């Protein structure tokens, strides 16, 4: 099973490398299927209004993008092991766009070739309070969610004597999508004449996160308000804290 997956991933890498340079000029890399949420507005603008060809490389075999058959979007699945490491080291492209930080500081390195690396934030949080030191140092350009990112990155560059990056005030595409979706809903989904509100609990993950420290107590208190409560755990929590989520589901699932 593992060997068969590895063979498929190497074949995918070979298929990518066989493309003409113009067809792999712009590459998006996704750690998992959730990355599409942040990439889609950019991909649609590039392939639609600008008429560009892009490659979308994912580490998840369950990524919905693999079922997307569009002439201007070529998809590849390279897994998250040896093949991915080889892909990054040997990448030949003009631009690589990714939501994964820590480029060059852990196992994912910059290519030996000349590639322009662009980082896209997948959250609104601070760039230095929620990430490792050096998480963004090796990117060439960063799409900033807000002024705090721009200020923090410039301060970091000055403090450590780093080469200035291209900082683009891009906003948060995910929030734009949510607001656009809400505007498209029928009025009975958004009106709250009954007094019952829809409360979404969608915190981050990790040892200090809200659900890991106060999950059951929080949900119990919120349910006591009589409102409709939805708990949406972080994708990394789904991956690494399944037992905790299972307990929450068992305790509050019927609600």
Give the positions of each predicted feature.
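Short boundary motifs at domain starts and secondary-structure transition points
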Residues: 13-22, 45, 87, 110, ...
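Active-site donor-binding acidic/aromatic loop of nucleotide-activated sugar
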Residues: 255
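Conserved catalytic-core segment of nucleotide-activated headgroup transferases in glycan assembly
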Residues: 35-51, 55, 173-251
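Membrane-proximal basic amphipathic "stem/tether" segments
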Residues: 1-25
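Active-site and donor-binding regions of nucleotide-sugar-utilizing enzymes
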Residues: 27-180
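A nucleotide-sugar donor-handling region in carbohydrate enzymes
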Residues: 2-11, 135-211, 235-238
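Nucleotide donor/acceptor-binding cores
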Residues: 22-25, 115, 196-199
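Short, functional N-terminal and low-complexity linear motifs
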Residues: 8-11, 117-123, 187-189, 215-217
């Amino acid at each position: 099973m593992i060997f068969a997956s590895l063979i498929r991933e190497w074949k995918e890498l070979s298929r990518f490398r066989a493309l003409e340079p113009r067809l792999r000029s712009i590459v998006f890399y996704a750690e998992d299927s959730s990355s599409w949420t942040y990439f889609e507005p950019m991909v649609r603008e590039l392939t639609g209004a600008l008429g560009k060809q892009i490659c979308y490389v994912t580490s998840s075999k369950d990524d919905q993008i693999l079922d997307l058959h569009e002439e201007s979007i070529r998809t590849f699945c390279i897994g998250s092991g040896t093949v991915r490491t080889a892909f990054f080291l040997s990448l030949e492209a003009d631009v690589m766009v990714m939501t994964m930080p820590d480029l060059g500081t852990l196992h994912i390195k910059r290519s030996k070739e000349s590639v322009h690396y662009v980082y896209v934030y997948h959250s609104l949080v601070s760039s230095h309070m929620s990430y490792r030191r050096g998480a963004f140092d090796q990117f060439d350009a960063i799409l900033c969610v807000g002024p705090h990112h721009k200020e923090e990155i410039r301060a970091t560059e000055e403090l450590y004597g780093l080469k200035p990056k291209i900082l683009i005030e891009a906003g948060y595409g995910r929030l734009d999508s949510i607001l656009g979706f809400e505007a498209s809903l029928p009025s009975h989904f958004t009106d709250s004449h009954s007094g019952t509100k829809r409360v979404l609990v969608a915190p981050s993950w990790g040892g200090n996160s809200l659900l890991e420290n106060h999950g059951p107590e929080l949900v119990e208190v919120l349910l006591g308000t009589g409102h409709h409560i939805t708990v949406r755990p972080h994708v990394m929590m789904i991956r690494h804290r399944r037992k905790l989520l299972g307990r929450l589901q068992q305790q509050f699932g019927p609600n």
